[in-house]
Amino acid sequence: MRIVEVTENKKQYLNLLLLADEQEDMVDRYLYKGKMYVLDDDGVKCECVVTDEGNGILEIKNIATVPPFQRKGYAQALIEFLVEKYRGQFSILQVGTGDSPLTIPFYEKCGFVRSHIVPNFFTDHYDHPIYECGVHLVDMVYLQRPL
């Protein structure tokens, strides 16, 4: 298993990016300003995009695993890679997600704790309703983990 930075042709991973953020123009807002990493384990299994949000905060903007390989530890391995790589350069690793029974427990298992909420984020910024595990996502829930 190896994790590599993608510096060119990031859109080749669009189908994977859209698993985590299903509207392409929203992905475009951070894809090229962020750093992208892919986890390769006999083929790409997982990707993430992180951005420098200032004030010592590194934010995971997108993280997704190829569906047949979900729940096998790939996303968690990618998060641990980020923690090790950016420790000392940033003080906080942050992620924003919907209030979903799928994502919140995953991030909490990875050591994140709830930080704050941006009300109506999904209803204000997406051109269609977003559902995950049958839950209509409205607010963006931010979680943080110290680096």
Regions found by a protein language model. Give the residues of each.
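Acetyl-CoA-dependent GNAT
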Residues: 4-67, 79
